[in-house]
Amino acid sequence: MDKLTLARVTKVIGRTGSQGQCTQVRVEFINDQNNRSIIRNVKGPVREGDILTLLESEREARRLR
């Protein structure tokens, strides 16, 4: 199992999923030297400033249309 990665939610982009059950957010990695940020889909309540524990840090979600 890969190591866990902490990421901070910087922007809530919108709702996604067939019934709007997921939220698409932009996250910035906390321990990364390059201030890398990616877009992820999050299930459950989330808002800006929340800290997420990502099991997979390389996967990025497709953008909303």
UniProtKB/Swiss-Prot annotation:
<keyword id="KW-0963">Cytoplasm</keyword>
<dbReference type="Pfam" id="PF01200">
    <property type="entry name" value="Ribosomal_S28e"/>
</dbReference>
<keyword id="KW-0256">Endoplasmic reticulum</keyword>
<dbReference type="GO" id="GO:0030490">
    <property type="term" value="P:maturation of SSU-rRNA"/>
</dbReference>
<comment type="subunit">
    <text>Component of the 40S small ribosomal subunit.</text>
</comment>
<keyword id="KW-0687">Ribonucleoprotein</keyword>
<dbReference type="GO" id="GO:0005840">
    <property type="term" value="C:ribosome"/>
</dbReference>
<dbReference type="GO" id="GO:0022627">
    <property type="term" value="C:cytosolic small ribosomal subunit"/>
</dbReference>
<dbReference type="GO" id="GO:0000028">
    <property type="term" value="P:ribosomal small subunit assembly"/>
</dbReference>
<dbReference type="GO" id="GO:0003735">
    <property type="term" value="F:structural constituent of ribosome"/>
</dbReference>
<dbReference type="GO" id="GO:0098556">
    <property type="term" value="C:cytoplasmic side of rough endoplasmic reticulum membrane"/>
</dbReference>
<protein>
    <recommendedName>
        <fullName>Small ribosomal subunit protein eS28</fullName>
    </recommendedName>
</protein>
<dbReference type="InterPro" id="IPR012340">
    <property type="entry name" value="NA-bd_OB-fold"/>
</dbReference>
<dbReference type="InterPro" id="IPR000289">
    <property type="entry name" value="Ribosomal_eS28"/>
</dbReference>
<dbReference type="InterPro" id="IPR028626">
    <property type="entry name" value="Ribosomal_eS28_CS"/>
</dbReference>
<dbReference type="GO" id="GO:0002181">
    <property type="term" value="P:cytoplasmic translation"/>
</dbReference>
<keyword id="KW-0689">Ribosomal protein</keyword>
<comment type="similarity">
    <text>Belongs to the eukaryotic ribosomal protein eS28 family.</text>
</comment>
